[in-house]
Amino acid sequence: MAKSPANNAAQRVRKKVRKNVSDGIAHVHASFNNTIITITDRQGNALSWASSGGQGFKGSRKSTPFAAQVASEVAGRAAIEQGIKNLDVEIKGPGPGRESSVRALGALGIRITSISDVTPVPHNGCRPQKRRRI
């Protein structure tokens, strides 16, 4: 006789841990295809995150400023539930969601203390890929 699927381990639901953190860092990774926002505390532990693709935007709509704004609002609301009031914003990448994601976080009522660009720039490191010819 087979075991029933109602197993104790399968039914165990993990309760969401509420941290009470007032200051944090918003890491915005804006690529040409997607925008990912991760909000962490000062030590780097993730409190909330969201991406344009995770909000239902697919294909070329993922890379729009509006999709980045929606993702920032989702991540920001989850961070406010954790107690975030002040954020430093670190933007990485050249994508179209750079500015709109920062504006969306500010519109939620989170105080943005600093905005810094941490896009990695090579000091003439690896050879780039060949040019596209269309």
Swiss-Prot record:
It holds the Pfam family Ribosomal_S11. It comes from the Bacteria. One of its GO terms (biological process) is translation. Keywords: Ribonucleoprotein, Ribosomal protein, RNA-binding, rRNA-binding. SUPFAM superfamilies: Translational machinery components. GO terms for cellular component: ribonucleoprotein complex; ribosome. Signal peptide: none annotated. GO terms for molecular function: rRNA binding; structural constituent of ribosome. Gene3D superfamilies: Ribosomal protein S11 (3.30.420.80). Belongs to the universal ribosomal protein uS11 family. Part of the 30S ribosomal subunit. Interacts with proteins S7 and S18. Binds to IF-3. Located on the platform of the 30S subunit, it bridges several disparate RNA helices of the 16S rRNA. Forms part of the Shine-Dalgarno cleft in the 70S ribosome. This is Small ribosomal subunit protein uS11.
